[in-house]
Curated annotation (Swiss-Prot):
<dbReference type="GO" id="GO:0072593">
    <property type="term" value="P:reactive oxygen species metabolic process"/>
</dbReference>
<dbReference type="GO" id="GO:0007420">
    <property type="term" value="P:brain development"/>
</dbReference>
<dbReference type="GO" id="GO:0022900">
    <property type="term" value="P:electron transport chain"/>
</dbReference>
<keyword id="KW-0679">Respiratory chain</keyword>
<dbReference type="InterPro" id="IPR006885">
    <property type="entry name" value="NADH_UbQ_FeS_4_mit-like"/>
</dbReference>
<keyword id="KW-0472">Membrane</keyword>
<keyword id="KW-0813">Transport</keyword>
<dbReference type="InterPro" id="IPR038532">
    <property type="entry name" value="NDUFS4-like_sf"/>
</dbReference>
<comment type="similarity">
    <text>Belongs to the complex I NDUFS4 subunit family.</text>
</comment>
<comment type="function">
    <text>Accessory subunit of the mitochondrial membrane respiratory chain NADH dehydrogenase (Complex I), that is believed not to be involved in catalysis. Complex I functions in the transfer of electrons from NADH to the respiratory chain. The immediate electron acceptor for the enzyme is believed to be ubiquinone.</text>
</comment>
<dbReference type="GO" id="GO:0051591">
    <property type="term" value="P:response to cAMP"/>
</dbReference>
<comment type="subunit">
    <text>Mammalian complex I is composed of 45 different subunits. This is a component of the iron-sulfur (IP) fragment of the enzyme. Interacts with BCAP31 and TOMM40; the interaction mediates its translocation to the mitochondria; the interaction with BCAP31 is direct.</text>
</comment>
<keyword id="KW-0809">Transit peptide</keyword>
<keyword id="KW-0496">Mitochondrion</keyword>
<protein>
    <recommendedName>
        <fullName>NADH dehydrogenase [ubiquinone] iron-sulfur protein 4, mitochondrial</fullName>
    </recommendedName>
</protein>
<dbReference type="Pfam" id="PF04800">
    <property type="entry name" value="NDUS4"/>
</dbReference>
<dbReference type="GO" id="GO:0005743">
    <property type="term" value="C:mitochondrial inner membrane"/>
</dbReference>
Length: 175
């Protein structure tokens, strides 16, 4: 009986030590501040009185962008929906409207043979979720624009048997 009670007492003491160690470990893992930094800053900002500034007239932001004026006033933007990729059957690439700038003068680099340009906007393609968003962005930046409307493909109705028609050139002879 003494051996049984000894093992029970030993188990209880070991269990208590383990519980104390786990409690100390879990206390050390508790962060000192439960809010993340950005959440804490938002909470601090909300305590102060905030007022929104509304402007009734449309502001011209072209002077604030830092782009030279010859690249702003004479730019033409093409707004379009890109064509579907032929390598896949999905329409993933055709949901967004793209804005592409016109190409300006390019020349060949005499050292490397690369195509060079002095136009900072020529290789930039902007994306917008709707046509109206793209148009408003172009107007806000002072760019003239052309819109290519979305081309909706007409489904061609044909039967499966048309693939095996005897008078159509669907099967090519190997001879």
């Amino acid at each position: 009986m003494a051996a049984v009670s000894m093992s029970v007492v030993l188990r209880q003491t070991l269990w208590r030590r383990r519980a104390v160690a786990v409690a100390a470990l879990s206390v050390s893992r508790v962060p000192t501040r439960s809010l993340r930094t950005s959440t804490w800053r938002l909470a601090q900002d909300q305590t102060q009185d905030t007022q929104l500034i509304t402007v009734d007239e449309k502001l011209d932001i072209t002077t604030l962008t830092g782009v030279p004026e010859e690249h702003i006033k004479t730019r033409k933007v093409r707004i379009f929906v890109p064509a579907r990729n032929n390598m896949q059957s999905g329409v993933n690439n055709t949901k967004k409207w793209k804005m592409e700038f016109d190409t300006r003068e390019r020349w060949e680099n005499p050292l490397m043979g690369w195509a060079s340009t002095a136009d900072p906007l020529s290789n930039m393609v902007l994306t917008x979720s709707t046509k109206e968003d793209a148009v408003s962005f172009a107007e806000k930046n002072g760019w003239s624009y052309d819109i290519e409307e979305r081309k909706v493909p007409k489904p061609k109705s044909k039967s499966y048997g048309a693939n095996f028609s005897w008078n159509k050139r669907t099967r090519v002879s190997t001879k």
